[in-house]
């Protein structure tokens, strides 16, 4: 009798906890490893490098963007990292400080294209940053004469 009561409680607790967990997961579309800032707007973007590989990034823009054009920064993380990790955090932080920023997955990594997967090439990484700078230079609100890059770890 006690076993059945305990089992019923465990099943009920599991259902309640599982239900709440699923509701929370559905309520949030934030896919990053860091907290979302209320100071920036984020837009998913795609662009190609000169080899035709499609790169995917998150464009971060200050919510209180002034009328004048802003400086911009392209950001990418170390080998194997994706924009939902450190590069996204750096980009979000700098956007909160008045920059338009682009955190992107390098070729062969994350949502970006390229085969084989999970390889690194200094030449391709250079082209990826060049493509990111080109992409930023034609965005509304970006001062094309004031674009920099942040390469984290091995990409620095």
Task: Please state what every model-predicted region is.
Residues 8-19:
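Bacterial N-terminal signal peptides
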Residues 141-153:
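Alpha/beta-hydrolase fold nucleophile elbow
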Residues 119-140:
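Alpha/beta-hydrolase active-site loop
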Residues 28-68:
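N-terminal cap/lid segment of alpha/beta-hydrolase-fold proteins
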Residues 93-113:
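Conserved alpha/beta-hydrolase
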Residues 85, 108-120:
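Glycine-rich "HGGG/HGxG" loop immediately N-terminal to the catalytic nucleophile
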Residues 68-78:
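Short beta-strand element of the alpha/beta-hydrolase
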Residues 80-92, 106:
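The serine-hydrolase catalytic nucleophile loop
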